[in-house]
Amino acid sequence: MQPLFFVKRGAFVNNLGEEIKDWIVSIVIAVVLAMIIRNFLVAPYLVDGPSMMPTLQNQQRLVVNRLIYRLREPEKGEILIFQYPKDPSRDFIKRVIAVPGDTIEIKDGNVFVNDELQTEDYILSKCRGDYPRVKIPEGHIFVMGDNRNNSEDSRFPDVGFVPFELIKGKAMVVFWPLADMKALP
């Protein structure tokens, strides 16, 4: 009587070796793709602190588009992540208030861009103090936190005008906690 099937000695070992090799190649490809996506396309970020309240809450998690500002310049009203100029290991999240060529001035807590009073329905309260009228230089932006009285931003010398090369990306979506999920401007 002949067996229904027959396996050459060692065929199982060869197939197992091929299977392991296929798994390793698949894992390496997945890791490389994940690194490319995270470094060049999108990345998760954690909101650390109250400077963007009420728009963003402390400990919320965001998806940040890392590609967009390689294709175009930031626009007023966008929320972005940038590298803190005084400490490259820290990232800040703020709103773009003025772009290159704009003038900005803060009088009696009111923000004026190009001599126009800004309607800012996203802030907690007007900021204390004034800021002299200045023109935003080319290749830089002026940023502020939505929680004006609890934000280290372009009004302070340690941040100042943010150079384009320090911008890491545009905040697109709050994804955690799930109850707070929303798209950002």
Where are these regions (language model features)?
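Soluble "head" domains of membrane/secretory-pathway proteins
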Residues: Q2-I20, V25, I36, F40-L46, ...
